[in-house]
C-alpha cells in the first residue's frame, strides 16, 4: 500500500512539473499563476502546495530537472572517449538532439537566465540548478583547455567560448517565430536539426580547431 501511495505521489509531482514546464516556457515566471497550473493538472491548489511551497520553488524545480537531464547527457557523452574534438562535437550533437526533442527546454532555459532575479536564491532546487550549470561549464571548460594544451584547439578565452557555445546551441531552439522567419523553416524539423549540427560542427572546425587539428 505504501508503494502505491508513493508512486501516486511521484506521478502527481511529475505531472505538476510537466505542466509547469510548458506554461513557464510559453509565458515566463510572471505569466503563470498557481491556480491556473493546479487547474491544468487537475489538482486543488492546496494539493499543489503539498508538493511545492511556492511558485519560485516550482520554477526552480522545473529548471533543475531540465539541467539535470542535460548534465546526464554530458557525462554520458564525455565518458565515451575520443580526442577533445570528437568529445566536444559528440556532446554538442547530443545537446542539439535533446533540445530538438523537447521544444520547451531551450525557451525555458533562456527565460531562466533573466528571470533568476525573481527567485529567492536559497531553495534546494535553485542550488541544484546552479550546481548543474557550474558543473557543466567546468566539464566543458576543462575539455576545451585539454584541447588547447595538446594543440587541437587554438588559444582562446575559455569563458567567452563557453558563452558562445551556449548561444550557438540553445538560442536557435528558443527563437520561435524569429528563427522560423530567418530560416524559412521550422528549426525542429528533423532536416533542420541535422543541418544545425553540420553548421555548428563547421563553425567549430574552422573557428576553434587549430590548423593541424583539422
Predicted ranges, named:
Residues 64-69:
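Short, basic, alpha-helical segments at the C-terminal edge of helix-turn-helix-like DNA-binding modules
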Residues 61, 75-107, 133, 158-162, ...:
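Hydrophobic alpha-helical connector segments
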Residues 1-2, 97, 101, 134, ...:
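C-terminal peripheral helix-coil segments that are non-catalytic and often amphipathic
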Residues 86, 128-132, 148-166:
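All-alpha amphipathic helical-bundle segments outside canonical DNA-binding/catalytic cores
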Residues 92-95, 109-113, 165, 169, ...:
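Short alpha-helical scaffolding segments that buttress acidic/His motifs in well-ordered protein cores
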Residues 101-127, 176-183:
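Amphipathic alpha-helical segments used for helix-helix packing
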Residues 11, 15, 23-57, 61:
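Helix-turn-helix
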Residues 1-11, 15-18, 212-214:
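N-terminal intrinsically disordered/low-complexity leader segments
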Amino acid at each position: 500500500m505504501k508503494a502505491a501511495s508513493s508512486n501516486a505521489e511521484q506521478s502527481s509531482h511529475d505531472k505538476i512539473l510537466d505542466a509547469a514546464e510548458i506554461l513557464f516556457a510559453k509565458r515566463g515566471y510572471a505569466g503563470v499563476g498557481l491556480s491556473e497550473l493546479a487547474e491544468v493538472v487537475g489538482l486543488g491548489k492546496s494539493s499543489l502546495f503539498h508538493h511545492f511551497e511556492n511558485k519560485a520553488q516550482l520554477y526552480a524545480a522545473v529548471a533543475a530537472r531540465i539541467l539535470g537531464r542535460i548534465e546526464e547527457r554530458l557525462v554520458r557523452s564525455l565518458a565515451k572517449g575520443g580526442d577533445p574534438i570528437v568529445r566536444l562535437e559528440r556532446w554538442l550533437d547530443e545537446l542539439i538532439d535533446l533540445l530538438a526533442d523537447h521544444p520547451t527546454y531551450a525557451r525555458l532555459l533562456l527565460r531562466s537566465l533573466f528571470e533568476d532575479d525573481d527567485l529567492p536564491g536559497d531553495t534546494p532546487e535553485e542550488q541544484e540548478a546552479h550546481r548543474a550549470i557550474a558543473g557543466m561549464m567546468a566539464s566543458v571548460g576543462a575539455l576545451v583547455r585539454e584541447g588547447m594544451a595538446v594543440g587541437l584547439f587554438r588559444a582562446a578565452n575559455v569563458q567567452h567560448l563557453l558563452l558562445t557555445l551556449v548561444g550557438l546551441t540553445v538560442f536557435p531552439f528558443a527563437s520561435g517565430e524569429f528563427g522560423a522567419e530567418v530560416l524559412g523553416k521550422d528549426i525542429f524539423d528533423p532536416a533542420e536539426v541535422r543541418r544545425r549540427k553540420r553548421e555548428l560542427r563547421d563553425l567549430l572546425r574552422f573557428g576553434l580547431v587549430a590548423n593541424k587539428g583539422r
